[in-house]
Structures are given as structure tokens and as C-alpha cells.
């Protein structure tokens, strides 16, 4: 799966052609702080490139501001609920404003870990076995069927918020209760022991895979955004055939959900070398710790080129 840089950069040569661009960031989700950092970096890059851009920290007056500002397109860099789950995409569709990233359905699906897994499983794509937790009895049944260790996840949060690895029933019940603070729907998955990879897509192409290493139990919020000892390996260390398999699996996983524009898939590899899909992010982080800019650099794109490529692939709103 060879990259074509000319195709990635198509439509980025004239920054003025984008018109007036609103960078949407912040919001009210648990990932607000990450979104503020991502939005600041995206806005700074667009302005430096000569794009007529301005930022909006998304609040209740958003629709009024979009109308008053007479914007030509929106760069969505909201993370989590209210921005990455299809609701913002639906608002922009209704307003007739083109926007970056995936559409309403793909955004909603990818934000919902349970339904993402169901789509993948229906197509025979590999993803860890799981259970839905709504009670202590569910925890007991999941423990009996899946065994330990397990990982508990809120179904609709990103940035590893509310996630925990557990090794016994008491830990599982406590982790379920903690995750339920963030989401009424909680999943528990079989723990896959082995290296974790992340693979970004941009304008229909798959960027170089990155292998993640952390002294933390898993690649959690601190490892993603705060730690200085997280290791990123690119090239990822897989042989050519295995990396091709990983990239092809990522492409199939994203296609199954209808991902467009850009995104990032997280994948585990077990001791037998098999890959397991975890989730897809439709508006990944764009901070100095973020993975999509890192993958883009490995492909030969600097941060500004990446931002312009994402913007150039804005989805036309049907209105």
C-alpha cells in the first residue's frame, strides 16, 4: 500500500480557496482539555499557511455564531461526545456547511465501541470478545465467560478515559462502577497481551503504522498526553508482509464504518502474531503528543501540510 503524496496534497496549494474557516474545538466532553490543545495547534497552522481561519470554543451559541460569521467550511477538532459522535456533523449538514472528517453515521458508529464491534464482527473482522456490563451480575457472568485479565471501557468515551485493566472480580466490579460515572453503557473486553499499534488514514490512504510502548499498564490518558517516557516506534518494526496485513486490516475496518477524510485505528497483536481491532477515532488528537502528526511526518508531511490535507478533503454538506 504505497503512499501518493501528490494525491494527499491535492487542493492544498491555494489557502485562500478554502474561504472563511471555523476551527471548532473545546466543547463539553471529558476530552475538552485535549481538544483545546489540538484546536490551538490546528488554528495556528492554518493562519501561518494563509488560511482565513478563526477558532470557536464550542458552546450553546454555536449555531448563531456559524450563521453570523458566514463561514465557508468547518475544521472539526472536537474530541468525544458532542463533536466526534455525529451530532456536530448533523448540525453542519443542516446548516449546509462543509466540514472535515467523517459524516454523521460513521462518526456516530465509531464513537460507539459496542456498535463498532458488532459491525466488525458481522463482517468477520477480528476484535476481542466482550460483554456489556449493567450490573454486578453482568460482571460475574463476564468474568466466568471471558476469564481474566480484562479491560473495562465506557462505550462512548475516548482518550482512554474511564478505562481500567482488571485481574479479578472485585476489581472488575469497581472498574465497572468507575466507568459508569462516564457512560451509562460499559464494555468489558478480553485483554490482548502483546504490542499495540496505531494506524492513521488520510484521504483514503493508510499512513505508516506506529508501535506504542509505555511503562503504564496500557496506553492510557497519562501515557497519551502527559508522560515523557512513552515510546513511539516508526517504522513500527513489523516485517513487510505483516505491516501490509496490518494496513489492509485498518483499511477494511475503516471502510466498514464509512470513515472518510481522516482517522486513526488502534490495533493489538497477540503472541501468535494475530491482529485485533480495538477502535477507530474519527477526530484524533493533534497535539505535540499526538499520533496522526507523527505518522504524517513518517510519510513525508509536516504538520501544516497535514492540516491543509485534512481541510482540503472537507465533506460537502448536503444541507
Swiss-Prot record:
The protein's enzyme class: ligase
Catalysed reactions listed for this entry: 2 D-alanine + ATP = D-alanyl-D-alanine + ADP + phosphate + H(+)
Cofactor dependency: Mg(2+); Mn(2+)
Biological processes annotated in GO: cell wall organization; peptidoglycan biosynthetic process; regulation of cell shape
Co-factor: note: Binds 2 magnesium or manganese ions per subunit.
Residue stretches making up the ATP-grasp domain: 117-312
One family name in Pfam for this protein: Dala_Dala_lig_C
Subcellular location: Cytoplasm
Name the UniProt record assigns to this protein: D-alanine--D-alanine ligase B
Underlying gene: ddlB
Amino acid at each position: 500500500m504505497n503512499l501518493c503524496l501528490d494525491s494527499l496534497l491535492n487542493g492544498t496549494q491555494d489557502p485562500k480557496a478554502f474561504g472563511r474557516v471555523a476551527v471548532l474545538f473545546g466543547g463539553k466532553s471529558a476530552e475538552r482539555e485535549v481538544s483545546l490543545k489540538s484546536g490551538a495547534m490546528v488554528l495556528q497552522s492554518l493562519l501561518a499557511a494563509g488560511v482565513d481561519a478563526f477558532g470557536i470554543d464550542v458552546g450553546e451559541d454555536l449555531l448563531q455564531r456559524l450563521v453570523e460569521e458566514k463561514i465557508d467550511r468547518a475544521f472539526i477538532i472536537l474530541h468525544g461526545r458532542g463533536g466526534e459522535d455525529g451530532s456536530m456533523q448533523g448540525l453542519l449538514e443542516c446548516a449546509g456547511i462543509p466540514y472535515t472528517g467523517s459524516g454523521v453515521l460513521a462518526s456516530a458508529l465509531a464513537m460507539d465501541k459496542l456498535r463498532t464491534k458488532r459491525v466488525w464482527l458481522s463482517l468477520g473482522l477480528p476484535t476481542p470478545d466482550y460483554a456489556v456490563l449493567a450490573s454486578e451480575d453482568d460482571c460475574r457472568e463476564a468474568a466466568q465467560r471471558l476469564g481474566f485479565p480484562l479491560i473495562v471501557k465506557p462505550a462512548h468515551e475516548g482518550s482512554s478515559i474511564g478505562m481500567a485493566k482488571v485481574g479479578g472480580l472485585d476489581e472488575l466490579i469497581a472498574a465497572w462502577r468507575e466507568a459508569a460515572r462516564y457512560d451509562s453503557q460499559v464494555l468489558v473486553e478480553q485483554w490482548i497481551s502483546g504490542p499495540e499499534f496505531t494506524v492513521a488514514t488520510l484521504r483514503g490512504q493508510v499512513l505508516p503504522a506506529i508501535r506504542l510502548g509505555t511503562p503504564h499498564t496500557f496506553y492510557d490518558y497519562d501515557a497519551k498526553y502527559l508522560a515523557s517516557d512513552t515510546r513511539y516506534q516508526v517504522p513500527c518494526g513489523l516485517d513487510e508482509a505483516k505491516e501490509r496485513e496490518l494496513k489492509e486490516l485498518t483499511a477494511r475496518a475503516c471502510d466498514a464504518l464509512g470513515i472518510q477524510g481522516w482517522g486513526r485505528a488502534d490495533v493489538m497483536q497477540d503472541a501468535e502474531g494475530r491482529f485485533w481491532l480495538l477502535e477507530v477515532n474519527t477526530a484524533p488528537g493533534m497535539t505535540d503528543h499526538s499520533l496522526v502528526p507523527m505518522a504524517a511526518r513518517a510519510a513525508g508531511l509536516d504538520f501544516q501540510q497535514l492540516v491543509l490535507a485534512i481541510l482540503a478533503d472537507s465533506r460537502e454538506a448536503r444541507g
